[in-house]
Amino acid sequence: MWEPEFACERGTPEKFTAGGAIKRKSLEDPMPNNPSAKIASIYRYPVKGLSPEPLPSVKLTPGQTLPSDRRYAIENGPSKFDPDNPKYLPKAYFLMLMRNERLASLQTHFDDATNIFTIRHNGREVAQGNLETAEGRADIEDYFRREFSSDLKGAPKILTAPGHSFSDVSAKVVSIINLASVAAIEGAAGQPVDPLRFRSNLYVDGWPGWHEFSLLGETLAIGDVRLKVKKNIVRCAAINVDPVTAERDLNLPKTMVQHFGHDDCGVYAEIITGGTVAAGDMIEIVSPELQLQSS
């Protein structure tokens, strides 16, 4: 079940609900409007609101997010999050770019082998800690207590739970951005728009602008991996923050509504069949008939 996304999430716009599976007469008929596309880049975000981390490749597991994507969050005031019974919480409970744009001024890195999380500011290391130990989490919490006091509603606390992701939606999905749609937004804004404003997992090159909205209900094939496109992503004020300068320099949701009649960009997809995907891999649409034959 999909939970509302704080200040962003809503139902899929009626004008996009017709993007279900396309029926074809036979397996020989080409899938209409199926342009060649590939994965341009892959990113994860180990701590919600903090730095994107590029991945050359990643192993996907059915029904899960990217490994360690939004694995941690920084609680901003009591959330009653229970690590023994983790449940979706709206982003308002955490430090986040929608309200706390200064987060983008930090350069952070999470090391999978050691669970060490490092924070740099202006190229200088300012905090480091093991996020799987109480002492290490305290080191990171102390940094935010000192440096983000004006943003805090209570003591900052690093939250995590096995298998849980602090995503903006309750379902475990991956997010996909069409780079041509970002280019269309850039044209409307009249100035460069860094695709990382959208904090997606898979960035796709080759689709026409807004083509992703026609894929709702379709299954994407990336080698042996299968992804089911589930839902448009509604955008909020987080995309107004430049990921390099940390300045809130644009009002992209307003620009999108004015120029395109919506504030959606990208889609969520569920991992149906797992495997490894890499930057440069081609993306195809699996026909409904082939899906039935393989089921």
Q: What spans do the regions from the language model cover?
A:
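Short, Lys/Arg-enriched N-terminal segments with co-localized hydrophobic residues
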Residues: K15-P30
